[in-house]
Each structure stands twice: as structure tokens, then as C-alpha cells.
Amino acid sequence: IELGLVGSEMCIRDRDAVLPKSESERRALWDIRENFEIITSREPCYLYDVSRPISDMDAYAERVVGDVRRQWPEGECYVFGHVADGNLHLFVTPGVEGDFHSQSDRLVYEPLTQYRGSVSAEHGIGVEKMPWLGHSRTETELALMRSLKQTLDPNSQLNPGRVI
């Protein structure tokens, strides 16, 4: 598996961990994380920001990478993340022309239910992730969110018609 997880102090690739021994090695690891334009230059490329428990990080990433490769043999799924908090950034490139966003969403978001994950780690839910919110929140949690929204914003002035 070509799995690259980059955290603030660790890089995991092909299931091996590398701990930087100097400031220059630490910067080199962060360069991988910050200079991802080469990945997004393959179009289409779909970016995701998910989280799940750290204990499920490897299993979830392996599943999504495998599912992407089965769906698109010419495709790739690159995974970067924060090892210490379970946050992953996935870059899915089907390797063929066309609009495969909804198929890619399904491959990334559906397994989150099994791995007790969230469709968003750092960047909020937003309109695009709204259809998938049920994969990471129970009906009870969604009802509580709606209730809080109604209590705090009874006139729906804050982001009207958006997520909740």
C-alpha cells in the first residue's frame, strides 16, 4: 500500500515510521505535507478532511485506498494526516476523465460509520458534506444539533438554510 501519513513529528509510509532527527529532517517531512500540488495536478482530484479514532486510522485508510483502486485501477488515493489526533486528508484521483465526485464521496464517507469517524475533522460540515453527515452522527445527535440551532438562532439569521 502506498500510504503516506504526515504528522507534526512523524511520517508513516508503507507502514514504516520515520521520526526526524533534526530540524532539517522535520522540515523535509512538512515539505511533503505542504507541497501537494503535484497530487492535485492530476484531474479530477477530490480532497477530503475526515477523522476517526487513532486506533482505526490504518484500517480505514487501507480500506479507502483499496476501494479506490478497485473502482479505478488507474486511480490513486493519497492519505496525509495528523497521526496524534486521527485527522486524515485524502486526495482521490480516479485517473480517468469525467465527474466522479459522488462516487469518490461514497468511497471515502461510507466506511466512516464502521470506523466511528466523522465526515469533517478541521473544516466543518458545509453544504457538500451535508448528505453524508448521517454517516458520522446519530439521529439523536442530529436532533440535538437542530435544537441547539433553533435555540441559539430562532430567526435563522446565521447561515440560513445551510447545514442545520
Feature locations, PLM:
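Conserved glycine-rich FAD pyrophosphate-binding loop
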Residues: 9-164
